[in-house]
């Protein structure tokens, strides 16, 4: 079934229980309750989900939103082993990881992860890679909600010096921080570490973990699911792919054939998409009214659709389906869970369902550039980052509902 296009108000379905309680008093909203221990409400009662579903971190929320249930936790050791065994883990945060004083030693408080989407095509050198998608995933200390905040790729940032490969630092677009960190042997790990430092300096947020998501690898995950429901809000011609004799291929490869090429056009409407189509659509920014902001929203839609499909298909409770999904995910991700084992992430975030994922936007979803043609984040966006850092997102959204990205 296609993703519904109805937008829900933030005082109802798109904020957590604490925020909904606050919204019930029209005159003076009550602030969210103090953070409760993981997996329990502020009243001390175990949290019960509307749709308890198993397996929450094979795509690491946002790129990983498959949720665990208390029922299926029994005997789940083998499932967790598959998840951890299929996904490469390495240090992606460097000095941008949370210190013990910031709560980095465990997951009892709020959880912040940096998700980086890269386009690593086989013909490209490993060092010639930029992070075109930059997302902060925030889970409040109540562990009953997840927020995705996309940072525009063209945001002007101060990239710090990186001693590991001799990069001296400088002013650049956010997407270029990954490229500079990957040079001179830095590789993807170096790219992620320099990006994490850059985003920490920009937002003030330290991270519990990070993931590099190869969008080409995502194709295998979607194909393992069969297809995912996506909605095209605005017709757009692909800037990356063409058809030659009915076969879809990269534009560069299509040109080499010497044959007539037909453009791939993503028509308006909702439908099930195969991996190549969903990924190609989520990559587009040229030809869209709001450029990179529309692309951010489409990529957030992709992530949420993958999570919902995985849960709806029962992939999380079927060992054979899960094995195939984990193997495909292992080709799409590099992961860093900091000082905490991946299994702990899975169990800590088992109370978050796909419908609890809130998609947020910076700068009101419109480009705001400077004389250099780079994006500059406005004061409201900076306040949103401050709300993430102080774990006040539910209250912030009640006060600023315009930051919620419209559902498709």
Ranges and model annotations:
Residues 2-64, 68-408:
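Non-catalytic, solvent-exposed segments at the cell envelope interface
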